[in-house]
């Protein structure tokens, strides 16, 4: 960032203090800084962070700041609309959770990459085998971990299936949830059925651990993880893994989770006009082209060349209608945390899919009614 920010400092006769915060507990550290009056003028935020800051007035509505050119230049500008306002400018996107498959396993099974739930379940069943004849399953259909203590694995274990079934988390008015409706129950029942083809220790491992111990070593036909895992995990740790990917399965529609993170103007900024100018500068075609040359990612602005992983170029160009972020709604973090724990009880068998979803929905709706 230094050469990019140097240009801004010189042009605007100011100094920019860029602070990089480690990802672990990022949202908690961010919130603590704001409550202590030590927050940034411009903050990097992801969807789950926004509700509390919008409700407390800590983040500025950009409706009167963003120009027509700003909006036209941004590829993912629609994601800026949150809870009745415009609270950020898209900064990081096009790194969705894709369905990876083991090409060698599918070839041995005589199967092509799946398109539908029916395809997926059939292949998972065929792939789940005792390959060495010792009486124990040693190859699985799906490497899926349910042991994470926090809700982040909803990105791979829940949202894609919910959206593919035609469901969503919130009703349109954001005053109640809908994930326990017919579509949500279809998704939950499907996930429960898939557990016959998932390693038995799924409740003791998270998704990353399942990839490291099962999919990466070639012991599963499928897993779901960020497209960037191709470089950060497979290329680094499993260079011999023969993999391919499907952007998202289809039931009622094709869908998968793809976060869009934003740069936001914080209400505590003393010079809001200058702070917004910084956002504009950082997100300009020139700046993003320079940044993505050093840190390869898909374009965030129109006119920017593609400098990301070539293996995902076609996906980025053609599947923008398949991957999507969360709808930002009130009490998001509390709702997601509770839902995750209820889904874990479903996987463990302590509750039926309907019981788990209904209990999570009751908690959520009681919270939203306060």
Q: For each predicted feature, which ranges?
A:
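Short amphipathic alpha-helical coupling segments at ligand-binding clamshell hinges
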Residues: 3-4, 14, 183-190, 261, ...
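Hinge/lid segment of periplasmic solute-binding proteins
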Residues: 45-97, 112, 121, 137-140, ...
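Extracytoplasmic/periplasmic solute-binding protein
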Residues: 87-91, 97, 121-176, 220
């Amino acid at each position: 960032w230094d050469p990019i920010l140097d240009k801004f400092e010189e042009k605007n006769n100011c100094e920019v203090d860029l602070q990089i915060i480690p990802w672990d507990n990022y949202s908690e550290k961010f919130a603590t800084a704001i409550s202590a009056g030590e927050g940034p003028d411009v903050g990097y935020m992801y969807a789950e962070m926004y509700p509390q800051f919008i409700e407390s007035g800590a983040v500025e509505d950009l409706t009167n700041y963003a120009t027509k050119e700003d909006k036209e230049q941004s590829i993912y500008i629609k994601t800026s609309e949150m809870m009745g306002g415009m609270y950020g400018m898209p900064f990081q996107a096009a790194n969705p959770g894709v369905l990876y498959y083991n090409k060698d396993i599918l070839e041995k099974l005589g199967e092509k990459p799946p398109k539908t739930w029916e395809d997926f379940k059939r292949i998972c069943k065929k792939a789940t085998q005792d390959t060495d004849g010792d009486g124990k399953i040693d190859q699985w259909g799906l490497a899926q971990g349910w042991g994470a203590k926090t809700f982040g694995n909803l990105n791979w274990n829940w949202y894609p299936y919910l959206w593919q079934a035609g469901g969503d988390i919130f009703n349109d008015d954001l005053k109640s949830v809908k994930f326990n409706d017919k579509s949500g129950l279809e998704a939950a029942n499907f996930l429960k059925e898939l557990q016959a083809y998932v390693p038995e220790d799924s409740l003791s491992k998270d998704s990353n651990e399942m990839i490291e111990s099962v999919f990466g070593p070639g012991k599963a036909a499928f897993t779901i993880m960020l497209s960037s895992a191709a470089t950060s995990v497979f290329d680094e740790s499993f260079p011999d893994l023969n993999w391919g990917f499907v952007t998202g399965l289809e039931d009622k529609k094709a869908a998968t989770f793809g976060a869009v993170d934003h740069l936001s103007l914080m209400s505590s900024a003393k010079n809001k006009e200058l702070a917004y100018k910084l956002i504009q500068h950082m997100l300009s075609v020139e700046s993003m082209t320079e940044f993505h040359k050093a840190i390869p990612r898909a374009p965030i602005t129109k006119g920017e060349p593609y400098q990301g992983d070539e293996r995902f170029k076609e996906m980025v160009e053609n599947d923008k209608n398949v991957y999507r972020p969360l709808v930002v709604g009130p009490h998001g973090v509390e709702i997601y945390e509770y839902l995750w724990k209820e889904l874990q009880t479903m996987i463990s068998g302590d509750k039926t899919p309907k019981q788990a979803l209904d209990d999570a929905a009751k908690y959520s709706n009681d919270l939203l009614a306060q």
